Amino acid sequence: RARGKYIAYCEGDDYWTDPLKLQKQVDFMEENPEYSMCFHKVDILSPDVKDIGLYDHLCEREYSAYEIYDRWTIPTCSVLYNRHKLKPLRPKTCIFGDIVLFLSLANGGKLFCLDFVGGVYRRHSGGVSTQNNNKLHKALYHQYKEMEKIFPDVREISNKRKINYLGLLLYDNSSRDTWKFRFQYMWLNKRLFISKFLIITIID
């Protein structure tokens, strides 16, 4: 287990490109103790040109938990966080552990993006984020279902993603649970429709 005050990530075949990356991030964190985590921009290496601008929207400012979850804002290889501000919350089913980590850190402090490019995020067809199969969809459905309870402040996003993955499981004839997923999908969509209708009615 790491014992230092700060922890930085560089997973798999991602890599850092700025030799002063860690110094810049530690300096920021030391000067701004109210922040639990900081991150920065990255270049993307991918065979798919659609991926190249994935993080172009990032700019130097504070980000909320809702923002980073809604748009999946943070490149994992850019992260440095204060270990003492981490309040670990983890669902039993966890495919994408990075977003769980970031939301947990958002509970312990603020999040900030620094204005420099400090690494390369490599995206390829074999990665978990690019896979498309029913086993993965089922696992993600359960992860978001649990995250609804663990992170109530961003429950709306978890619910939408849960319904999205549930919809992808409706036609999986190889699973005994398909009928359950179909029933849950109908019920969740009904609740979502009623909620939106009530909100619109109240506003009008």
Task: Give the predicted meaning of each segment.
Residues 158-172:
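Amphipathic alpha-helical repeat scaffolds of TPR domains
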